[in-house]
């Protein structure tokens, strides 16, 4: 738009040209190339497309209902702070409003309506709403659409009486501006690995493990899609599937971690609030053929808040596979802070940071063949006290990127984050997982552990090409910690931690101590061969703020540039 028009032009031509420019800026994008079902039952479908030049994004929400429907962008997957639109068709016609939520109550109508309704129809029990907005927004009641994955929320009713949505609601994290489209394969085939009528004990926290052989295949297959199969959504907190080494040859079912675990190579992961996961078209999880027939260990974390005994569960995972092999075998690498009870978070902390480091320099120490990691997705994981998770990427001593960020982590909505583009982690790079916790409502120490009331700080990296690698983590060197705090032994240190008067000063001092002391860095392969070395925690930069620029400003600037150009031409 900033290039001057050459040659003589009549007034009529100029007018026609200006009209065509206005039509260019105002035209709607008719294409909706991206599509996601926001719920497991496929009752709610979102289609979208965007135009970065115009700075607009177009949505089409389709819901199997004759009542009201709503869609929103949420900071953390819940109602509070969400940017919401509600619409429908009643006996008076269509209705549509731009709103924001202050809490778990009726969203408030925005003073400025920044969403534009394009069409709204209802037929055969389905309501379809198409609407448009700017990608960026400076309205304090609207959330900007960013290049990072965002938590999308939806709700709907059976009638046009807008009321509380009960169970007809949900959330899904989607990278709207850097979406990786799904593969579409006909005649889909799948197999399940699940518990079979497991009867829960009356424990609040219980980890149950089942080791079983997967189906055998004569030739190599690629798993391209993983779906949760959940019997009791109120009990199942997360699922993990590990591949076992060849030394595991018998099925087994028992409480997890009551004996030495040999199956530790992560193959699949699902967390509460998450949905299905599809691999990019260039990669798939290998199974069968020359990969071998392995046993797999399914781990289910049950969070039985009411301690009810006797409930039966058959939850697990469903794996869609194909004989049409992708270019690469995919793998999952667990990184972050090693889960140990000696790691403690003090009570009364408004913001307490912990760190876990993966130093890829040592991957070749445990593998005969090691490659750079092409990371395409990440799942970040803490428990109830977690508020933020960031994964920093360092090369040659300098931070080059934030591999993944969740500034509004929500324990109830844990999903695999699609990075939108593949990021290369070279051998020798360091990855730093930083978790921020809030323990203001706690009176005692929070330890690292398996219970929901304990804590974790992990990031599962989805990458290719796959390596026989299970973990790359770190933990503070415990002897250094005890010495730095002036405790003679473990017992004295534990007594100090439990009796200390925790305040802002002592909390900050302890946090700095944990960060500055030596760290034990552990890299483990699929056969439990480990490399154990020392390392230090680098400084992680503050996340860059998202710029607040109105789309109309770009539009006005373009018109101004055009008119200045034309004025210059007329004057010459």
Curated annotation (Swiss-Prot):
Residues 42-157 form the DOMON domain. Residues 27-552 are extracellular. Residues 1-26 form the signal peptide. It is a single-pass type I membrane protein. Cu cation B binds at residues 381, 383, 456. Keywords: Copper, Disulfide bond, Glycoprotein, Membrane, Metal-binding, Monooxygenase, Oxidoreductase, Signal, Transmembrane, Transmembrane helix. InterPro entries: Cu2_ascorb_mOase-like_C, Cu2_ascorb_mOase_N, Cu2_ascorb_mOase_N_sf, Cu2_monoox_C, DBH-like, DOH_DOMON, DOMON_domain, PHM/PNGase_F_dom_sf. GO terms for biological process: dopamine catabolic process; norepinephrine biosynthetic process; octopamine biosynthetic process. GO terms for molecular function: copper ion binding; dopamine beta-monooxygenase activity. Its main location: membrane. Binds 2 copper ions per subunit. Its EC number is 1.14.17.-. It holds the Pfam family Cu2_monoox_C. The chain crosses the membrane at residues 553-571. Belongs to the copper type II ascorbate-dependent monooxygenase family. This is DBH-like monooxygenase protein 2 homolog. It comes from Danio rerio (Zebrafish). The gene is moxd2.
């Amino acid at each position: 738009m900033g290039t001057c028009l050459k040659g003589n032009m009549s007034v009529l031509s100029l007018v026609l040209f200006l009209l065509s420019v206005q039509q260019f800026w105002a035209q709607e994008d008719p294409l909706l190339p991206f599509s996601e079902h926001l719920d497991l039952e496929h009752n709610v479908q979102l289609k979208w497309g965007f135009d970065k030049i115009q700075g607009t994004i177009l949505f089409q929400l389709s819901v199997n209902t004759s009542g009201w429907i709503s869609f929103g962008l949420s900071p953390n997957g819940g109602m509070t702070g969400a940017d919401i639109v509600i619409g429908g068709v009643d006996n008076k016609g269509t209705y549509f409003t731009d709103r924001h939520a202050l809490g778990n109550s009726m969203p408030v109508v925005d003073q400025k309506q920044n969403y534009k309704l394009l069409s709204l129809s209802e037929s055969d029990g389905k309501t379809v709403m198409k609407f448009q907005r700017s990608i960026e927004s400076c309205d304090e009641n609207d959330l900007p659409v960013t290049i990072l994955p965002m938590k999308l929320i939806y709700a709907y009713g059976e009638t046009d009486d807008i009321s509380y949505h009960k169970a007809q609601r949900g959330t899904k994290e989607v990278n709207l501006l850097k979406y990786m489209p799904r593969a579409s394969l006909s005649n889909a085939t799948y197999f399940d690995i699940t518990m079979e009528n497991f009867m829960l004990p009356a424990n609040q926290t219980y980890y149950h493990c089942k080791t079983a052989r997967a189906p055998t295949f004569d030739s190599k297959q690629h798993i391209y899609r993983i779906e949760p199969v959940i019997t009791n959504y109120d009990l199942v907190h997360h699922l993990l599937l590990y591949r076992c080494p060849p030394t595991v040859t018998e099925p087994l079912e028992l409480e997890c971690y009551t004996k030495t675990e040999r199956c530790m190579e992560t193959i699949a992961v699902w967390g509460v609030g998450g949905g299905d996961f599809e691999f990019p078209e260039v990669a798939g999880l290998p199974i069968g053929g020359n990969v071998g027939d392995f046993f797999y260990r399914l781990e289910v974390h049950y969070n039985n808040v009411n301690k009810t005994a006797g409930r039966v569960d058959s939850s697990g995972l469903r794996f869609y596979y194909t004989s049409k092999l992708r270019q690469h075998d995919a793998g999952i690498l667990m990184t972050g802070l090693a889960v140990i009870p000696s790691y403690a978070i003090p009570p009364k902390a408004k913001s307490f940071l912990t760190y876990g480091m993966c130093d890829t320099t040592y991957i070749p120490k445990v593998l005969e063949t090691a490659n750079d990691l092409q990371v395409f997705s990440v799942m970040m994981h803490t428990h109830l006290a977690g508020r933020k998770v960031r994964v920093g990427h360092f090369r040659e001593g300098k931070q080059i990127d934030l591999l993944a960020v969740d500034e509004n982590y929500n324990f109830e909505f844990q999903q695999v984050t699609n990075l939108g583009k593949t990021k290369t982690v070279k051998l020798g790079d360091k990855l730093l997982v930083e978790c921020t916790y809030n323990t203001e409502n706690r009176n005692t120490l929070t330890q690292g552990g398996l219970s929901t009331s304990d804590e974790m700080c992990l990031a599962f990296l989805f990458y290719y090409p796959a390596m026989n690698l299970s973990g790359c983590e770190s933990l503070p060197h415990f002897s250094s910690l005890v010495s730095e705090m002036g405790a003679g032994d473990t017992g004295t240190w534990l007594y100090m931690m439990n009796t200390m008067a925790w305040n802002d000063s002592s909390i900050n001092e302890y946090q700095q101590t944990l960060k500055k002391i030596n760290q034990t860095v552990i890299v483990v392969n699929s056969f439990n061969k480990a490399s154990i070395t020392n390392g230090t925690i680098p400084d992680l930069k503050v996340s860059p703020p998202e710029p607040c620029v109105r789309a109309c400003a770009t539009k006005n600037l373009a018109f101004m540039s055009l008119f200045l150009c034309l004025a210059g031409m007329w004057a010459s």
